[in-house]
Swiss-Prot record:
Organism per entry: Homo sapiens (Human)
One GO cellular component term: actin cytoskeleton
InterPro entries per UniProt: Actin (IPR004000), ATPase_NBD (IPR043129)
Chain coiled-coil ranges: none
Name by which UniProt lists this protein: Actin-like protein 10
Domain of life assignment: Eukaryota
Family: Belongs to the actin family.
SUPFAM superfamilies reported in the protein's UniProt record: Actin-like ATPase domain
Classification via Pfam families: Actin
Amino acid sequence: MASTALLALCSTGAFSGLAVEAGAGVCHATPIYAGHSWHQATFRLNVAGSTLSRYLRDLLVAANPDLLQQALPRKAITHLKKRSCYVSLDFEGDLRDPARHHPASFSVGNGCCVCLSSERFRCPEPIFQPGLLGQAEQGLPALAFRALQKMPKTLRTRLADTVVLAGGSTLFPGFAERLDKELEAQCRRHGYAALRPHLVAKHGRGMAVWTGGSMVASLHSFQRRWITRAMYQECGSRLLYDVFN
């Protein structure tokens, strides 16, 4: 076992920075310094890929009531989300102006074809505005800022220089640009204008944790820290925290 945030950072060749993960089940903003996670400065958002897939289905049914009678497999909805959805850089403006909706038709199988309009950019928006789902949590950019803010002043700039995106839900077109824009706005709004976060958004970031894990496992320095089955049976799960924290 290892910190997914650390492995995401390692996939870029870094051992210090801020990992911003958005996967299927949850989002995290985790500061990493010298290979160690700062759990007290880690923030979690319970809105991620699976939540967005359910939200997209609700949006589709609301716009096309006839779909309620259709069997819409979860896999088909997830595929539709990945193919068609994107993050708006001006959500309120796009929502008000139908000319900016970019409607498109997509097949969801079983001979069923749906037309998406504003749903294309409304689907990922709860990661930035959880209130759209009735949740009181802050959006991911605010959590990323809080993670940096909670770190010692002497480390903030170094961590902000490497803000690594990881996870399949960061692959929406416009995601990196929106996060960058809002994270900078958070810094200015709270009096940290000198803090200039630099996002690292690699093309393979959907598999960043796996890639980082394969890289770390090949390091001789890491192999010396492997936990054997006998060690685990003797010490139990406490040993994981002693080794990896």
